[in-house]
């Protein structure tokens, strides 16, 4: 049997021993089932290892195990299979996080760039997948390329670390070791986009991974070649809540809210076009369903029109009234009444988001049904507000609310040392119309 079998078999035994620590250790005999008793005796393994095969336990210290490995490597250093054997053993050590054994292998010629024959991952990729941060640091200190991508998926170690919440320690270590936080794969996908795309809001919550990447300088404007942005995943997950399990929908909404908070805190713009990639636009279209998130967006300063092209591209006012006019219902319909109430609050939030109201051109509506008069009155109040110079009272309300941004503005309003009547006026949900006095 060649050195490849020698080193591989010995490494398996050493790996298991290292995992159990010093003292009485049970070997994983299943890992030696491919070796016959005769073949095992032919390996240059000390008698203690062969006895362990039969007795399933042995006593050895970590130092003695390192010594065994070192002696074997020195004895077989001139074998034609040496390089392949030690490099293959390094992959196994990386998987199990056995840093001392890996260090011995590296000092004795193991190739940092050796790839697993099945996955084509290097030892660094494997260490990340198994969440072995100390192994990650050891490999990088020995010269492993911290940004190296695998040949199949073009995933970097940072990409892999970002995809699972359990790999947060490796993610942090990679950033500390200088990994490029904004490096992109062949599809233009950065580690931040990997973290977002891997989250389902129910079983996988990469919130802390996303936070760490953003704090490490991840670009919130990153876009893939297919046009996916940091909000693409959130928009998709919000769509999954429609008609789904209520408990799962609640979990998804909570995750989307938390991630949106993080993204906006680091400068992400949820109101950019195209409309189908705009989180603000999506929330406006379904403002009743996504009311808490929409409120957060508007109270955090998100534009209610397209932030790139203004109301000529898309307008929040137009979207809200389009939704109101298309909703079937009657005056006694609780769902329609709730829709109207939330529409009033959303419109009020948009009005207090800027000192000068910006209504879209050709802003005409044609409501039908028993609530048509109320919808028409709401529309008329906005037209009036746009037609006349804003009152001092309105300007003060807008300025104070803008000053109290970001969310939650109403909580901050209630904490102000003001009379209750003034607080009532500053709150977004106080009025039945957008503005009672023009």
Where are the regions that the model predicts?
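Ankyrin-repeat boundary/"N-cap" motif
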Residues: 44-56, 80-90, 115-123, 149-158, ...
